[in-house]
Amino acid sequence: MVKAMTSSPRTVGRPREPDLDDRVLDAARSVYGERGWSGFTVDEVARRAGVGKGSLYLRWPNKAALLVDAVRSAAPSVGNINLGNLELDLREFARQWMAFVQSIEGTMVSRLIMDRHSNEELAAVVGELDYPDYIRSTRALVRRAVRRGEIDPGITPTLIADLVAGAITTHVRSTPPGLAEVAHTETYLTQLVDTVLRGVGYRHPSAQDSPGDDT
C-alpha cells in the first residue's frame, strides 16, 4: 500500500555502507523523537550509531540535512491508487493518510514541519525538497478524474489534497488520546470525502451514463 519516500540529497563522500547509513538514520530518529530539534546533536547521533562524527559529515553537510533524511526515509508515501473513479480513489487516499498521520512516522513528520518554522537551517533544507508526496499522488487522481469527465478541469489538484489531508491531520491531532480508539474513523472519512466531492462538483460515472442526464 505504501512505499518509501525519496530521501533528500546527500553530499558525495566515501562509498556508502548501507548498514552504517541505516544505523545512523535510526539513531537520528531516536534522538529527535526523544529530544526534539533543540536537543538533536550530531555528537549524540554518532554515539548511538557507534560511528565517528566525521563519518556523518562525510555523508550529510549538517545536522538539518541528516534529520530531514532520517525522517523522510522512514515515512511511507501515499499513492499508487487507481480504483476507477475519484470517489473510490479519494476514500482510499483518506484511509492511507489517516493511517500515516496516526503512525510514529507521521507524528515525526508533523513535528519536523513545525520545527522548521522556528529554525532557519532546518527551513532551508526542507525548502529545497520537492512537493510533498501526497500532493503529487493526489494530482494524479484528480487528472484522471478530469479526463473521465468527473470534475471540471479548473479544479486545482493541490486544493483537493489539502482539503482531505489537512482535515484529517487536524482531526487526528485535535482528538484527545483517550477518545482516539473510540472515534468513528470510517464515518468521519466518509463524511469528509463526500463533503469535498460535493464542493468540487463531482459527477459520478454512473450518473453521467444515466439516460436521464440527456434530457
Sequence positions of predicted segments:
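Short hydrophobic/aromatic patch on the recognition helix
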Residues: 50-60
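Hydrophobic/aromatic-rich alpha-helical bundle segments in the mid-to-C-terminal region
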Residues: 124, 132, 146-195, 200-215
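Basic, helix-initiating cap at the start of DNA-binding domains
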Residues: 1-48, 65, 77
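Hydrophobic alpha-helical connector segments
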Residues: 78-110, 160-161
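Hydrophobic/aromatic residues within well-ordered alpha-helical segments
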Residues: 63, 70, 97, 101-105, ...
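Amphipathic alpha-helical segments used for helix-helix packing
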Residues: 65, 70-71, 101-128
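Short, structured helix-loop boundary elements
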Residues: 21, 42, 64, 83, ...
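Short, basic, alpha-helical segments at the C-terminal edge of helix-turn-helix-like DNA-binding modules
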Residues: 71-77
